[in-house]
Amino acid sequence: MSDYKSTLNLPETGFPMRGDLAKREPGMLARWTDDDLYGIIRAAKKGKKTFILHDGPPYANGSIHIGHSVNKILKDIIVKSKGLSGYDSPYVPGWDCHGLPIELKVEQEYGKPDEKFTAAEFRAKCREYAATQVDGQRKDFIRLGVLGDWSHPYLTMDFKTEANIIRALGKIIGNGHLHKGAKPVHWCVDCRSALAEAEVEYYDKTSPSIDVAFQAVDQDALKAKFGVSNVNGPISLVIWTTTPWTLPANRAISIAPDFDYALVQIDGQAVILAKDLVESVMQRIGVTDYTILGTVKGAELELLRFAHPFMGFDVPAILGDHVTLDAGTGAVHTAPGHGPDDYVIGQKYGLETANPVGPDGTYLPGTYPTLDGVNVFKANDIVVALLQEKGALLHVEKMQHSYPCCWRHKTPIIFRATPQWFVSMDQKGLRAQSLKEIKGVQWIPDWGQARIESMVANRPDWCISRQRTWGVPMSLFVHKDTEELHPRTLELMEEVAKRVEVDGIQAWWDLDAKEILGDEADQYVKVPDTLDVWFDSGSTHSSVVDVRPEFAGHAADMYLEGSDQHRGWFMSSLMISTAMKGKAPYRQVLTHGFTVDGQGRKMSKSIGNTVSPQDVMNKLGADILRLWVASTDYTGEMAVSDEILKRAADSYRRIRNTARFLLANLNGFDPAKDMVKPEEMVVLDRWAVGCAKAAQEDILKAYEAYDFHEVVQRLMRFCSVEMGSFYLDIIKDRQYTAKADSVARRSCQTALYHIAEALVRWMAPILSFTADEVWGYLPGEREKYVFTGEWYEGLFGLADSEAMNDAFWDELLKVRGEVNKVIEQARADKKVGGSLEAAVTLYTEPELAAKLTALGDELRFVLLTSGATVADYNDAPADAQQSEVLKGLKVALSKAEGEKCPRCWHYTQDVGKVAEHAEICGRCVSNVAGDGEKRKFA
């Protein structure tokens, strides 16, 4: 028997079946770096319209986690897709380098700055530590396949950036937004310094828990509110607290606007309590005989005044969202100098931020005769005795509760108001302008707008000063007597900024005031405060975007971060940009959800459900991680687990196999000389290119809308359904058995070529490594990298006016689906083995019959059977299968007649009819020794 294998056009490619991504990707990365791929892209895109995605800087501390990966991959997908859409989209990654976590790391190793270890040395160590952290994170970000200017990132600790941060503050001061005030901060009396949240630990502590009566100033007004006239004794509003020592600083009582408050008659007096807490308070204070005289909503009591039990002044009732019914009385003692909630509500009502406590934790002189000079924790008993003496104490008991302590000394800390600098929300209309700017920004998802609007509408002034060592100095001089800013502040700040640009922030601490103030130096002091790190990152629109040459003076188009950044970077950037320039720093803001495990639980080391991006890249490869990110709806929580990643790997295989099929069947195809003109192509091939065109329209629309899971779904549908289960199946016969250089085969290869050119580009933003690999195997002249080009423009489709248009092939797909069902059943019943052992008769209504007969003998190729006949629907035998999808179709199957051709595997009556080729069918003889078969339709 002759061997006809050599006469077949079998698929052949060097593109491997297995991705082996974990092994191959590092080599590709090395090539990208050696070639300076990022630089090549910039050169290719020069002069095109820009799209600037400004990188929100991650903090330079610790290894990257899965959330970082999601963030950087989403950014990279956008930047690459914008490049393919014809934009110049430079990406400059950044890092946030100042602040407390870095200070703590340095402190753990070297101790706090003191005489032996100077503040200058401390800062140098912080700078060194941050640089090593940046290097570690940069390696991992690059490994993700993220393209950017990794050799020239922006760091908030770059000297030039530090100088520009000072300039940003200068502009805000020039525009009149800065003011000085007091704000409560965590304060350790042993450190004699403010603590950040990260330096606070919680331990159990026993404190006195007290209920205190504040007597109403206008008793009649209260009776009127409750609609009662007969009350026995004075009326008081009752507060509950576990910090009696803060009562000297009380300036109000907070109640909830929507709670019901009851006026309760007890022995000799009446008290006001939240109605839902009356029973528990009565039990606590040991009263069994009481009567509720009336109730009102909290809002009714707003601004009524109550006498402080011992300080000799009265205070208002105010409305606050922080009031709860979890414990206490429903009325909260409010001391703006001693608590963050109290401070925020105090700002709203214009209350004094009183702070009667010194840095050592003792009361300042003039606070109260029996309290002056007393340590606050020793003062609790004195205050309780004082309340008892004044008849204001309803109840006292000891209570154990969780209390904030200093992480160094393990001793209890206090909240204490200290002088700070603020960006005012209202003195120059910053709040109103910010709210206006928010409306001009596109928020993705759109609920982001309402979220940031409510935050801006309700936020207090922004405290931008910090008492830290490692941070950008505020660079201010204040008069030592009046504490007023120097009249030439803006000029002086520019002078400092110039020095910082050369020597970094240390230049400020090394600066002798005389150098720039001359004779005035004796009258002024340098402000020792540093800026809140949120000011560093929030001013990058000015300190980085406005000055980097690749951004060419354009503002950022997009900020993209996790949903926690509405109150973080999106907010600080909006405040600073609006305060400096009167406008938002971004046109679009996209937020993604947090990562959770497969069961929707938050990731935590203690549960052991974290997924390390490094592990995923080392086992599965970065492209699998990228595909998982793209295929997950980022608008909500993003679930990730081994099982979910395995599903991503399965999808990846489907896409890779499709690409490999295309490449293997483009073997021997040179687009410059083998391409068939559209009008000469087989109709089915034009349909397939049209499918790619339709898919491309959907995919580009989805990229444009940042709907990446839609991109992946459409890509999968194209690979699996339109190509895999229909077109690629049908063309194997023609591709393998037709004459190598025949129009029938070259038409098919032309379609595959167009499809591959489009597919590789659709993949590129998401499956960057695989797209680069595919690109290297595609035939024809091309640029070195897929990333320098644009979406493929060579696609075309069938015209609606043609008889065999898209609707025709859609119907044929359905017919084929129905035939497949019948074949599957016959295989299950052992009537046939493969589909080529079958011949089918399609009994149809006239309209469908006309379409099917138009294909002539080529119908069998579409159905993958050896025979296909069309007959009248009414002639169908009883055993013909009625289609559930197409009402006018019944399918009957029989075993194909004739012999199996060993070359094409079809069963035909003409095997062996040509003496020279006695083993193969007539069609194969024509393809091997004649002019080759002609195909018009399929």
UniProtKB/Swiss-Prot annotation:
Residues binding Zn(2+): C901, C904, C921, C924
One GO term of the biological process aspect: isoleucyl-tRNA aminoacylation
Positions of modified residues (N6-acetyllysine): K183
Chief localization: cytoplasm
Entries under PROSITE patterns matching the protein: AA_TRNA_LIGASE_I
InterPro entries xref list: aa-tRNA-synth_I_CS, aa-tRNA-synth_Ia, Anticodon_Ile_BEm, Ile-tRNA-ligase, Ile-tRNA-ligase_type1, Ile-tRNA_ligase, M/V/L/I-tRNA-synth_anticd-bd, Rossmann-like_a/b/a_fold
Subcellular location: Cytoplasm
Protein name, per record: Isoleucine--tRNA ligase
Gene source species: Escherichia coli O157:H7
